[in-house]
Amino acid sequence: MAWLGIGMGRQIVPVLVFVAVLCSGVDASFNRYSFPKDFIFGTGSAAYQYEGAAKEGGKILNGDTGDVADDFYHRYKEDVNLLKDMNMDAFRFSISWSRILPNGTLSGGVNKEGVAFYNNLINEIIAKGMKPFVTIFHWDTPQALESKYGGFLSENIIKDYVDFAEVCFREFGDRVKFWATFNEPWTYCSQGYGTGIHALGRCSPYVSTSCAGGDSSREPYLAAHHVILAHATAVHLYRTKYQPTQHGQIGITAVSHWFVPYNDTAADRRVVQRSLDFMYGWFLDPIVHGDYPGTMRGWLGARLPAFTAEQAAAVRGSYDFIGVNYYTTYYAKSVPLPSSNRLSYDTDIRANTTGFRNGKPIGPQEFTPIFFNYPPGLRELLLYTKRRYNNPIIYVTENGIAEGNNKSLPITEALKDGHRIEFHSKHLQFVNHAIKNGVNVKGYFTWTFMDCFEWGDGYLDRFGLIYIDRLNNLKRYHKQSSYWIANFLKRKKY
């Protein structure tokens, strides 16, 4: 039905909002005015998942790649209009390192066309009354640097990353006021170098025979160490050279599950803390406190790189805000010590995490089966961040739910996503609870703006507020959730 398409969106907002609210059972009185006046609402994306114009072949489900993705590179003006239609305050996106520095290094030259694309995008976002939130690195290390010295396994990456970051600060920082150095380094390091299920696909042979080499007991920690040092060096550069005149903020985006003890025992309570330390504290403890969590140091010993006194001083306090990505909560249960000759990041945690206890899920299991819909977990993670990390400024930079890419489903049915409306409404209510309990949360970004390339799952998952028809020239359609959020964010006219 053509009237459900993007072009006619404004004409049917009231009807579909009414239908969506009725279907979801959400509280219509809960809206943007339930939050502090300066609270920022937005949605997010990532360069490789959206832009297209990538050339590397895929080695993931269905053989999918990001070569075309959502073709955001050519359609960004149309897409920024969609953001405006949803009354968003901000748009979160990442900058492709290779699009700016094709050879990965400053000496290899700056791609002026890449710089022009991001300048045009930033200008368009601002022209529509929104704020750009920019991630400098979202998992797309230039292949040239992987081939040259092994990417983040080498300390050489620090200088090249900071050179890339400086190009971004210099070219875009007069308009960009929110920078995140890295997105989810936990995912990049643990799954790229520990399990091999994400790029770069490295792991020990006893973890997976499909990995292209690696050491799951050491490489995740080495790569993470270089990420943290690169982050701190870039923050220092920004603070000393650009922040005094550009007046922006800089931080990092971490991801964490929330964890609940499987049994009410001291052992399982300890494993909850250990799980948080190995996932969340791995990055935030150094950045806030100057060193890795004691649980990591005590177990890993020499496998965990050490900060020099000078490095620790540089890393400590290297943030203006913390971005928090949250998707699920698990039960955590203690397990026996792992075999000393089959160590890996996963076995180092010494935990069994599951969404089920006595056959019952902790929350409804989602289409993405590793995720369980448990909104209180977001509140608990925010409260924990307040307690452990000195009540920092926080932006919830990702939170979302998917449905499957059912090609046999008529588009008119595929646009009915009441589950997403309920998901965001309930999670926002728990964010609101956290704020009322003193957590310094300043914003909330849905994942994601449009259905996109979801890394290892390719195009099987649809997380977007906007439906992408991959069988019809990537045509955009509003899902019901996009109308709901437009209504939720609608400003009063005085």
Swiss-Prot record:
Reactions accelerated catalytically: Hydrolysis of terminal, non-reducing beta-D-glucosyl residues with release of beta-D-glucose
UniProt keyword Ubl conjugation present: no
Signal peptide start-end: 1-28
Annotated InterPro entries: Glyco_hydro_1, Glyco_hydro_1_AS, Glyco_hydro_1_N_CS, Glycoside_hydrolase_SF
Glycosylated residues (UniProt): N103, N263, N352, N406
Any one biological process term the GO annotation gives: carbohydrate metabolic process
Keyword annotations of the record: Disulfide bond, Glycoprotein, Glycosidase, Hydrolase, Signal
Enzyme class at the top of the EC tree: hydrolase
Enzyme Commission number(s) of this protein: 3.2.1.21
Pfam families in the record: Glyco_hydro_1
Family classification: Belongs to the glycosyl hydrolase 1 family.
PANTHER family membership: BETA-GLUCOSIDASE 29, GLYCOSYL HYDROLASE
Name of the featured protein: Beta-glucosidase 29
Species name: Oryza sativa subsp. japonica
Gene: BGLU29
